[in-house]
Amino acid sequence: MAIYKIDIPYKFPSFNQYVNECRKNKYAGGNMKKKIQEDIMYFINKLQQFKTPISIKFTWIEGNKRRDLDNICYAKKFILDSMVKAGKLKDDNRNYVIGFKDTFEYGKETKVILEIKEEN
């Protein structure tokens, strides 16, 4: 059972920001998601392709406590979709991603740390 760790030094928009973008017009939310996925793929391209189910621990590191936790961790959807788009996962359904855990810390650099564990 291998564990892979990757840092994504990226400040994701809050869920509220994403919803507001989606309300602007029918293309704005999709364009925002596409841009975020392209940014994420830069960091996840060094990952291998996972052929067995995985679980992921997300450690969300923020510079302060201003944003609600649920407004931060919704971004896992962008990360998982990016992993599928980059060919690292066949799909992000329950057959391939069997669980995840969110933890939150505060530091100088806003980022998310993924700990991906292959399950057998």
Locations of regions flagged by a protein language model:
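Catalytic phosphate/metal-binding cores of nucleic-acid and nucleotide-processing enzymes, i.e., regions
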Residues: 1-120
